[in-house]
Amino acid sequence: GQVAGQYLFDNYSGKNVAIVHDKTAYGKGLADATMAAFEALGGNTALYEAYTAGEKDYSALVSKLKQNNIDALYVGGYHTEAGLMVRQMRDQGMNTQLISGDALVTLEYWAITGDAGQGTLMTFSPDPAKDPANAGLVKKFTDAGITPEGYVLYTYAAIQTWAQAAGAAGSNDSDSVLDSLNSGSFDTVLGSLSFDDKGDVTLPGYVWYVWENGGYDYL
């Protein structure tokens, strides 16, 4: 939310910004955090709307965006709905910039949007698949027919972390492993991980990705 809010302010301050969400804890939380950060910097949200996930036709919302001359649309939600929205915006001749979060870091997004997804921006943590140290592991995944995109290697890191914590604890007992997790540092495909006093994992900061020609990469 903070990173996206800053980007909106830096690039769209004084322009028409819309923020929409799918009413889920994830989507609304992301949208609200982005709007709070944007407006705290002095930005003005021209339109704030909720939509229903699972629908196929977002033409009413898109028409509203068009009527309000929206320059940038932030979507707090998942790739399916965001993909339909950007496709329907392009069908209505709109060049509005679509921005979202980590849920759009999946090849399924482009399968929905086609060329309409060109230039879509999203925030996500640095891609561990691009780390040369993980080249061997990435090859194992691809050889098995699995593209290590999105959260695949993050899930792998979670398993690595648990296994190391259990090993350090000398037990699979949940309380023992939890104590080990809270006090240790763990070597993973993401780098060295530990947990803070709140129990949150210390991960690298968010970076920007852009969709171009059927794939996504760092902006």
Whereabouts are the PLM-identified features?
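Extracytosolic ligand-binding ectodomains
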Residues: 1-219
